[in-house]
C-alpha cells in the first residue's frame, strides 16, 4: 500500500514523540551536571565554561567517584598501599581540582580560623563547602570542627607557665677508685635539661604548629597530633601525643620531681681486682728496637694500643681454664678427640677458612667438654656446631648450615645442628673472645722480624699440638712462645745451636723467660717425634706442600739440642 499524506504525518508525529522521550533524560543529566559545576567551580571563579554544552554525558547517573564506563583504569603493579585504597586514584591533582574538599588545614587556614574566633566571627568560608548535605560537605564540617579543637588545645598550652630548669649543685670532690682528686677552683654548674614545654607566643602559632595526620577521614573518631622533633625533644625517647597535651604535662612533672631529689655526687669506682690485673708496660730496653714506635703511623698495626691489647689477652687467659675432662667423659677417649681435630683441619682446608677460625673452634669444643658430658654420637655434631660458631665470629662470609650438613655426610639434620649451636653458646656463656695461641704467635714473630719459613714452621708445630690432648691445659701465650723458640732453633741449623735464640727482644714483647715455658717445649717436641698414624695425616700433608715451604720435612732436634747454649737442663729438671 502506498503511503498517503495522513500516514506520513502520523509517522512524523510518532517519531517526534520518541525523540522527545530519548532527549529528556539527556537534558536532565546535563542540567544536573551544570548545577554541580556551578556549586563547585562557579562559586570560586564566577563564570561558566562556554563549552559546557559539549560535555560528555552519561545515560545513567553513577556514583561520584565511579569511573567512566568506556575508560581504562591503570593500576600500579604493587597496588595502592594506603588505608583509603577505594577512593584513591592515580591522579590526585585532578581529584583535588574536582572535589576541592578533604584537604589538610594549612597554616593560613589555621591563622584565619584563629582570627575569626577572636573576632567572634566564625562564618569564614575557608574550605568552600557546598550547601548540599553530602558526604563531602559533612567531611568539610568535620574538618572545621577538628580545627577548632586544635585551636582550643593550642590556647590551653599557651596559657600554661613555663617551668624553670633546676641546676644540679656541683660536687666538691670526685672519687676515682680510691684516689681523691682536689676540687675545682670554680666548679661549673651543669643545668638539668628538661624537655621543653609548649609555652609558645601567640604570633608563632602559625610557624610552630601541631601537624594533623589523617589516615582515613571517613573512619576517623578522634584527633591524632604528632609533635615533631623540633617542637618536643625528649631526653630518652620520642614522645607521641594522641590529641592530648595533658600527657606531655604529666611527663614533664614527673621529670621535674626526679630532678628535685637530692643529687648524688659522681662516683667513678673501679673493681677491686682491677689494679692486680693491670700489667704495667715496662720501658723499652736500649738494645731492643721499638717495633710499635717504628710503625706508629701505620693504622693497621694499631701501635698505639698493641702492647695493651696483648697484655689484656694474657690476663684473660685465666678466665678460660681447661682442666682434664676426659675422666668425666665416659663415652669418649683421647683418640676420638684426635680424630675430631684432624677432621676439623680438613674442614678448614675444604672451606678455605682462616686459621683463627680453626683454633677458636677447637677451643670451643674443649670448653664445652669441660662442662658437659656427651656421647660419641654427638661428638662430630659438637665439632660442626663449634666450627659454625667460630665462622660467624671470624669469617667475612661464613659457610651455610647446609655446607656443614654436607660435610658431615648427612649424619645430622638442620634442627639438630641449630639446637647444638644454641646449647654450645649457652654452655660457654656466649663468651667468644678467647685468647688464641695463633694470634700471640703472629704478634711475637712480627716484633722479632721472623722470616716467613720460620713462622710457618712455628704454625705447623702449633697446629700439630691441637690434636694432642696433653696440651689442652697450657697457656696460649706460652704455647706461642714455645713454638716460636722451637722453629728458630730448628731453622738455625747445626752451626747455630750455641747461639742465644731467645733474645732480649723476644723477652720484652712476650714477657716470658725461656725457663717459663721450657716444659711446654719438651711436650711439643715429643709430639713432633711421635710416629704418625695413617689415619691422621691431614696436618702433615698440609704443611708438606710448597705453599707452606715444606716445613713438615724439616729435621727434628732433641731436647738437649733445643736448649743447648740457652738453658741448662739440669737446673731446670728437664730431660
Curated annotation (Swiss-Prot):
GO biological process terms, semicolon-separated = G1/S transition of mitotic cell cycle; mitotic cell cycle; mitotic cytokinesis; syncytial blastoderm mitotic cell cycle
For this chain the motif D-box maps to: 75-83
Q: Which cell locations does it reside in?
A: Nucleus
Q: In which tissues is it expressed?
A: In embryo, it is expressed in all mitotically proliferating cells, with a high level in neuroblasts. Not expressed in old embryos and thereafter. Not expressed in endoreplicating tissues.
Task: List, in alphabetical order, the Gene Ontology terms for molecular function in this entry.
Answer: cyclin-dependent protein serine/threonine kinase regulator activity
For this record, an example GO cellular component is:
cytoplasm
Instruction: From the Swiss-Prot or TrEMBL record, give the protein name.
Output: G2/mitotic-specific cyclin-B3
The organism encoding this protein is Drosophila melanogaster
Per the record, the gene is CycB3
